[in-house]
């Protein structure tokens, strides 16, 4: 029996479990078992899979979206996955969404699955992909990309209120209404209705009167069916009377609605943003063509010889902290999958110390650790003595230790992501042209296309590709120094205001370390001298190292003579840009009175440039944020559930700066 754990500060707890003598998992919190001890799989199949008319319900659909309230052990998911893989169309896609307020850990999941031996391969895949108990959305890709599992960790009603999806079938499987009333509230039923379409089916084990009344009030037609075993009845239903619901996203940020599904997509840029997007879209079944002006992927800002992949924790629960937590755990999962076949994406050595930059920063980082409530295998505090011992150099202060973070080889990573993507290198796109049937892409000599959609992932030069969109990112030059490795035995990365990577082997076989980096605004994109390294920039980062960590800095005789410079795409509010590109003139007309506080219900829907999308403004955090944005773009184009909470979608939306300006009274 595991000890009961208190909810963490993000509002999510973990499952408190006891195990009966027959190995049935039991929840003391809800005084109930997770499944029937002798016939759990049979009962779940009867109540839930047969309740939504599986497999017939998905056999004529290229995409099927199923959602569950109460993931629990994941037994319903495993049974659904097993049946879907055996009966779905050859090119079908399954999207499975599940809410869970008290997730189990990996060991408990595996133990709960042990009685169902025929599900062992699916169980192993689920356990391996299982995220830590951190609040928010966690999307995982299974079955070679044919199945996405989107886990919503947190209270059911509030998590579903953040969801953007169209659900075809529901499993209502929380603990009994008398033991877990929050899972069966009118607020939750309203979210079920909002997320459903005409004809959406539902199935549940309970026929409680409050549940039936709540669902009928939301437009569902219900009927009782014979229960399983000693249970007399179970519940089945169909949404036959959809009700109008207030959107969970303001109209000026509402996702675009396409009349026809996207089949082909062109992606401009083979840095980490474009590569991650291409990978995710390819796995979603889209026809992907990538264009890159250089001869190989990862040639500009994503071409550094070693790049740090590390989380960003914030002192308090915030949009910033929640977004970067979601991005970190998504990227960690993707990189683990890639490393199974291409271990070279990681440089040797794992683990990163984010050292406090001052005594005040000690308190800030400790508060960030407390509010994140991350498990220690992902974040823990090291005092100065421990940090100094582990990193092999005297450090004035402790910091946050991230055991799973580390140094990546960005160009190898980009190449791995693009391994099966059709790509045109040394092909500089200079103009995008909308056509009645899509988009054509033009170089100075020829054109390509048409494509249903275009994703601009061109970094700092993105605004030049379609000026009408008024993409608001700015360019910032960054320069890093490449030094001979001072301590080859130190295998950990260090962030101290600047950063120092662990040693890696360069193309000549020499052990080197990267010391970074500078930030310099670059206003003139026609001035290509940004790629030239400046001695004063080398001096600046070396001086910062020596002032902060003099004993470490003294291991080098002076500033580096080698390095690398590139342009980053940055944003004034330090948040990235993601999503459909807007028609700015239509926004200025339609939302001219936003500053008057007009009600949301009276506002016109967003006007987008049809089929044109952006991943940009990633700054120096591309390795952290690009994988999540790739998955989001794949969902947006293919019609899957968006793995981003609604308020985070609004926070990264390309229209946000314009909308903020329109909300201010004119001078």
From Swiss-Prot:
Alphabetized UniProt keyword annotations: Cytoplasm, FAD, Flavoprotein, Methyltransferase, Multifunctional enzyme, Oxidoreductase, S-adenosyl-L-methionine, Transferase, tRNA processing
GO CC entries: cytoplasm
Alphabetized GO MF terms: flavin adenine dinucleotide binding; oxidoreductase activity, acting on the CH-NH group of donors; tRNA (5-methylaminomethyl-2-thiouridylate)(34)-methyltransferase activity
Gene Ontology biological-process annotations: methylation; tRNA wobble base modification
Cellular location(s): Cytoplasm
Main location class: cytoplasm
UniProt-annotated stretches for the region Disordered: 1-20
CC cofactor: FAD
InterPro entries tied to this protein: FAD-dep_OxRdtase, FAD/NAD-bd_sf, MnmC-like_methylTransf, SAM-dependent_MTases_sf, tRNA_MAMT_biosynth_bifunc_MnmC, tRNA_MNMC2, tRNA_S-uridine_synth_MnmC_C
Region span, FAD-dependent cmnm(5)s(2)U34 oxidoreductase: 268-667
EC number: 2.1.1.61, 1.5.-.-
Catalytic function, reaction form: 5-aminomethyl-2-thiouridine(34) in tRNA + S-adenosyl-L-methionine = 5-methylaminomethyl-2-thiouridine(34) in tRNA + S-adenosyl-L-homocysteine + H(+)
Residue ranges of the region described as tRNA (mnm(5)s(2)U34)-methyltransferase: 1-240
Positions with biased composition (Polar residues): 1-12
Main function: Catalyzes the last two steps in the biosynthesis of 5-methylaminomethyl-2-thiouridine (mnm(5)s(2)U) at the wobble position (U34) in tRNA. Catalyzes the FAD-dependent demodification of cmnm(5)s(2)U34 to nm(5)s(2)U34, followed by the transfer of a methyl group from S-adenosyl-L-methionine to nm(5)s(2)U34, to form mnm(5)s(2)U34.
Family per similarity comment: In the N-terminal section; belongs to the methyltransferase superfamily. tRNA (mnm(5)s(2)U34)-methyltransferase family. In the C-terminal section; belongs to the DAO family.
Cross-referenced NCBIfam families: MnmC_Cterm, PRK01747.1-2, tRNA_MNMC2
Protein name: tRNA 5-methylaminomethyl-2-thiouridine biosynthesis bifunctional protein MnmC
Chain's gene name: mnmC
């Amino acid at each position: 029996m595991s000890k009961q754990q208190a909810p963490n500060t993000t509002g999510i707890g973990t499952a408190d479990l006891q195990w009966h003598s027959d190995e049935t998992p039991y929840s003391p919190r809800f005084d109930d078992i997770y499944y029937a001890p002798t016939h759990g799989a049979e009962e779940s199949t009867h109540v839930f899979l047969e309740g939504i008319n599986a497999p017939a319900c998905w056999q004529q659909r290229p995409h099927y979206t199923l959602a569950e309230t109460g993931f629990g052990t994941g037994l319903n998911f495993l049974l659904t996955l097993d049946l879907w893989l055996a009966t779905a169309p050859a090119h079908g896609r399954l999207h499975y969404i599940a809410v869970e307020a008290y997730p189990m850990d990996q060991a408990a999941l595996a133990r709960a699955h042990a009685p169902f031996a025929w599900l062992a391969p699916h169980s192993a895949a689920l356990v391996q992909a299982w995220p830590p108990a951190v609040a928010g959305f966690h999307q995982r890709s299974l079955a070679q990309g044919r199945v996405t599992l989107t886990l919503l960790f947190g209270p059911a009603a509030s998590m579903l209120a953040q969801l953007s999806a169209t659900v075809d079938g529901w499993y209502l499987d929380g603990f009994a209404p008398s033991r877990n009333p929050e899972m069966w509230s009118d607020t939750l039923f309203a979210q079920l209705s909002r997320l459903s379409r005409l004809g959406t089916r539902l199935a549940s084990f309970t026929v409680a009167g409050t549940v039936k009344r709540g669902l009928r009030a939301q437009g569902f037609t219900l009927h009782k069916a014979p229960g399983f075993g000693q249970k007399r009845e179970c519940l089945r239903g169909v949404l036959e009377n959809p009700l109008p619901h207030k959107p969970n996203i303001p109209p000026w940020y509402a996702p675009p609605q396409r009349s026809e599904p996207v089949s082909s997509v062109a992606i401009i840029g083979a840095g980490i943003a474009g590569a991650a997007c291409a990978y995710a879209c390819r796995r979603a079944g889209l026809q992907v063509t990538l264009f890159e002006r250089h001869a190989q992927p990862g040639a500009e800002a994503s071409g550094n010889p070693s790049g740090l992949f590390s989380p960003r924790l914030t002192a308090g629960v915030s949009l910033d902290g929640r977004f970067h937590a979601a991005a970190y755990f998504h990227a960690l999962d993707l990189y683990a999958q890639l490393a199974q076949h291409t271990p070279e994406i990681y440089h040797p050595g794992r683990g990163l110390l984010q050292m406090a930059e001052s005594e005040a920063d000690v308190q800030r980082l400790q508060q960030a650790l407390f509010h994140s409530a991350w498990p220690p295998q992902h974040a823990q505090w090291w005092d100065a003595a421990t940090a100094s011992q582990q990193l092999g150099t005297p450090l004035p202060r402790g910091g946050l230790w991230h055991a799973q973070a580390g140094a990546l080889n960005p160009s190898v990573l980009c190449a791995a992501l693009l391994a099966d993507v059709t790509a045109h290198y040394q092909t500089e796109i200079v103009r995008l042209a909308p056509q009645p049937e899509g988009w054509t892409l033009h170089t100075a000599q020829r054109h390509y296309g048409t494509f249903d959609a275009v994703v601009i992932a061109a970094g700092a030069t993105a605004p030049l590709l379609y000026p009408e969109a008024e993409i608001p990112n700015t360019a910032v030059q960054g320069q890093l120094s490449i030094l001979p490795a001072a301590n080859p035995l130190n295998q950990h990365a260090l962030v101290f205001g600047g950063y120092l990577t662990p040693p890696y082997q360069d193309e000549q076989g020499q052990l080197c370390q990267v010391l970074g980096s500078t930030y310099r605004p670059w206003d003139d994109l026609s001035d290509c001298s940004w790629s030239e390294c400046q001695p004063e920039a080398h001096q600046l980062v070396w001086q910062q190292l020596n002032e902060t960590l003099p004993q470490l800095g003294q291991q080098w005789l002076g500033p580096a003579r080698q390095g690398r410079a590139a342009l980053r795409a940055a944003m004034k509010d330090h948040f990235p840009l993601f999503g459909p590109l807007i028609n700015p003139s239509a926004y200025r007309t339609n939302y001219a009175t936003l500053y008057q506080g007009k009600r949301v219900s009276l506002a016109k829907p967003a006007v987008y440039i049809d089929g044109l999308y952006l991943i940009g403004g990633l700054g120096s955090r591309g390795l952290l944020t690009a994988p999540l944005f790739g998955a989001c773009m794949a969902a947006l184009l293919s019609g899957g559930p968006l793995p981003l909470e609604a308020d985070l979608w609004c926070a990264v939306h390309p229209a946000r700066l314009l909308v903020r300006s329109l909300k201010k009274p004119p001078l």
